[in-house]
């Protein structure tokens, strides 16, 4: 079909689930945001990607979805009734749709989202500096206040780290020799989370004008920089291509998959006592030397960049902390055993520590490269600012791996889900989530009732409608 009839509201149907007979696919169901139908003939064992002609009979766009930010997103609520898709519209091989989708996700996570986030942060950087230098409060520019100097220094260090980590992952992707699933996910989390924080800090420096839209400021001749739009847009990149809360456990499980597979027979519950003892001896034979090795300092690779006097001390810290993280992870696996798969209190901290360690390595090597190739010696100040912040986070999270109070807050959250704290909703007009659906239905019904009554517009306000 002509290009104009393809995807007017969606960019790609990546993993529609359907059986593919000899000549055509029949689709039935409805979708929102990511099109995955539930209908006759659907088989969750066969994920096949194909192009859907949006002008095909039975395809109907019910609604163009609207979002907090990124107003140009072409996502929609679609319905499909007996839609027939020619088999020549299948992309690649039948049953390989999920594989294609996950491959595309690596590109989005590791390349697209870090690039977008980095661009947004860079776009906000110079206007934020100009605001800090130009805004005077109580006869003193914001730039002369320690609170704002610390805030801007932290922003600068993390902006440099985002660029360094992104460049590292992009180089790995360009080589086409590496499985970058973990690195892509880490880059996505790091850049999206720190961009949100970066932009919110910038908005704080703009004060009330940071909450005002660019169009409103332009109307009276102010500098029409839309920091509020960047803040709204950035939230999407925390969610898109894998939400942070999903990716953190994913990274840990991917990174530890060979350890989890090694211990799986022991926790399966299918072994006799004798077989369990044999399995323990086998695991001990592997993990005893592994554990002892992680107490011993490992030499850094022989490379001039790693031997740089400002790089090597940080890399030794990363090497030392990586061994400690490996030991702490081993303790956690022994402590929680089979339950470790769902122990997100520990998994999230393990991922966060590893994320900062990878970003530290990328930042120091990027600073060395910038100095060697471009003579930019000021980058060491940026690297040091990030180093300070990252080490503080790492130290805190290492401590929390064994000493945290998440059990208390987790129990409170569970009790809240069971309805134990009704007083938290007191003092307002109480509504449940479904009440807003009914409210929307009433709002749609009122204009139709007005039209059916044929009441002049000037008199509609006098009607006493229920």
What spans do the regions from the language model cover?
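Short, small-residue-biased leader/transition segments that mark boundaries at the very start
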Residues: 1-12
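Extended, hydrophobic alpha-helical segments in both membrane/secreted and soluble proteins
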Residues: 13, 101, 114-128, 132-227, ...
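A short core secondary-structure module
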Residues: 13-61
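Glycine-rich beta->alpha junctions and the first turn(s) of the following alpha-helix
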Residues: 60-159, 235-240, 253-256, 268-355
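Generic structural signal for well-ordered, non-transmembrane alpha-helical segments
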Residues: 119, 150-156, 160, 185, ...
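C-terminal helix-coil-helix/basic helical segment that borders enzyme active sites and/or dimer interfaces
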Residues: 159-192, 203-213, 337, 359-391, ...
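Glycine-rich phosphate/cofactor-binding loops in nucleotide/flavin-utilizing enzymes
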Residues: 209-307, 406-466
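C-terminal catalytic subdomain
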Residues: 243-260, 347-365, 371-374, 379
């Amino acid at each position: 079909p002509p290009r104009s009839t393809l995807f007017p509201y969606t960019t790609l149907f990546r993993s529609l689930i359907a059986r593919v007979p000899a000549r055509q696919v029949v689709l039935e169901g409805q979708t929102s945001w990511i099109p995955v139908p539930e209908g006759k003939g659907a088989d969750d064992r066969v994920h096949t990607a194909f192009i859907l002609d949006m002008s095909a009979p039975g395809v109907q766009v019910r609604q163009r979805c609207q979002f907090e930010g990124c107003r140009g997103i072409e996502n929609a609520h679609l319905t499909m009734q007996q839609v027939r898709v020619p088999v020549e519209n299948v992309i690649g091989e039948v049953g390989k749709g999920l594989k294609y989708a996950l491959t595309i996700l690596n590109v989005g996570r590791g390349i697209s989202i870090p690039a977008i986030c980095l661009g947004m942060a860079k776009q906000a950087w110079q206007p934020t500096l100009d605001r800090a230098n130009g805004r005077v409060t109580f006869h003193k520019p914001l730039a002369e206040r320690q609170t704002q100097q610390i805030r801007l220094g932290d922003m600068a260090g993390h902006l440099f780290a985002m660029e360094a980590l992104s460049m590292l992952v992009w180089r790995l992707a360009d080589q086409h020799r590496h499985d970058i699933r973990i690195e892509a996910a880490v880059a996505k989390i790091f850049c999206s989370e720190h961009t949100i924080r970066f932009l919110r800090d910038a908005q704080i420096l703009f004060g009330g004008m940071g909450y005002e839209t660019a169009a409103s400021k332009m109307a009276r001749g102010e500098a029409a920089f839309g920091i509020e739009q960047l803040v709204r847009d950035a939230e999407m990149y925390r969610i898109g291509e894998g939400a942070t809360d999903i990716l953190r456990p994913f990274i840990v499980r991917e990174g530890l998959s060979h350890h989890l597979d090694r211990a799986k027979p022991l926790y399966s519950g299918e072994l006799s006592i004798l077989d369990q003892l044999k399995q323990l001896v086998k695991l001990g034979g592997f993990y005893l030397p592994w554990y002892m090795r992680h107490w011993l300092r490992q030499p850094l690779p022989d490379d001039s960049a790693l031997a740089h006097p400002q790089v090597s001390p940080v890399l030794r810290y990363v090497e030392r902390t990586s061994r400690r993280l490996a030991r702490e992870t081993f303790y956690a696996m022994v402590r929680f055993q089979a339950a470790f798969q769902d122990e997100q209190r520990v998994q999230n901290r393990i991922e966060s520590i590893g994320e900062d360690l990878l970003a530290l390595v990328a930042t120091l090597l990027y600073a060395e490269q910038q100095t060697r190739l471009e003579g930019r010696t000021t980058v060491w100040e940026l690297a040091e600012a990030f180093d300070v912040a990252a080490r503080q986070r790492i130290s805190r999270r290492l401590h929390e791996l064994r000493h945290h109070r998440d059990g208390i807050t987790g129990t409170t959250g569970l009790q809240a889900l069971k309805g134990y704290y009704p007083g938290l909703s007191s003092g307002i007009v109480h509504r449940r989530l479904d009440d807003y659906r009914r409210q929307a239905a009433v709002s749609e019904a009122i204009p139709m009732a007005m039209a059916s009554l044929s009441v002049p517009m000037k008199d509609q306000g006098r009607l006493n409608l229920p």
